[in-house]
């Protein structure tokens, strides 16, 4: 049964899927140019910056055109227009404007042409602070910037908050195969590439091709023996305490090496059973942003999984732009969660004891 049947957020879901699909087209065009030109940094003039802004503008446009207007439009997103309004930013603003307009024309759905001022205004649609009341869209226009630059995994991640709760999430993963991932950077041999994950509260989770295909219901794996489990973590070592995640895996009895991929594509892969566990333990002092987890977490929970902080608390997306949580984020199926939580807490305790002076 499709999520549209009996889904109170069916119209919002359709708009969200359309929004991230259009944004993905823009991102794919830019990534192709990056790989051909050899760009490898997120400098202010770099193509990835253009793609970040362009993706956000297109998502905002489609949502405002397609999603039911319950009240004033509100979106919590990563980018604002401050840098683009500064002296010296004219060239990058010109590039963004040109790319967005080209994408809209190529798509053919909307007869809209953005001026530069219209571009700046559309970017600032994402300046909402979110919070516990009302409806707020939550967007990461390119999650996994370094993966995007390398030609690896990235995601356009969009969720809807309703009264502080995530009720809908979509993940466009242009480089993720539709088949189960088979190596350590999320690639797969021979499978069609470009996955679109979606979930609505109470209606389950699905995956379909970004190019358009019937949606298929997905569910997390049913593994209950940690020895048979594999775990996902960030590709970038700077994003993760690998000594800690390695200790957790060892205490749990996991024998497979970690599968390291960028972005919330990890949540999508976990939700369809490609692996059993996701561990995210950033370095001390890092504050998690809600757009880094809102869409991915509901895809996993609607696929039958659990997503919590290191103490087993549900993630609270109602506190504004940041998550207020304990230490890290873990996700797995219901069978493995009790033993995973114990391994996490034992490993953290051991690490803290080793770090404290005698």
Curated annotation (Swiss-Prot):
Mg(2+) 2 binds at residues 140, 143, 292. AMP binds at residues 239, 263, 266, 280, 292. Mg(2+) 1 binds at residues 78, 140, 142. GO terms for biological process: phosphatidylinositol phosphate biosynthetic process; sulfate assimilation. Optimum pH is 8.5. Adenosine 3',5'-bisphosphate binds at residues 145, 239, 263, 266, 280, 292. Phosphatase that converts adenosine 3'-phosphate 5'-phosphosulfate (PAPS) to adenosine 5'-phosphosulfate (APS) and 3'(2')-phosphoadenosine 5'-phosphate (PAP) to AMP. May regulate the flux of sulfur in the sulfur-activation pathway by converting PAPS to APS. Shows no activity on myo-inositol 1-phosphate, beta-glycerol phosphate, NADPH, NADP and 5'-AMP. Belongs to the inositol monophosphatase superfamily. This is 3'(2'),5'-bisphosphate nucleotidase. It comes from Oryza sativa.
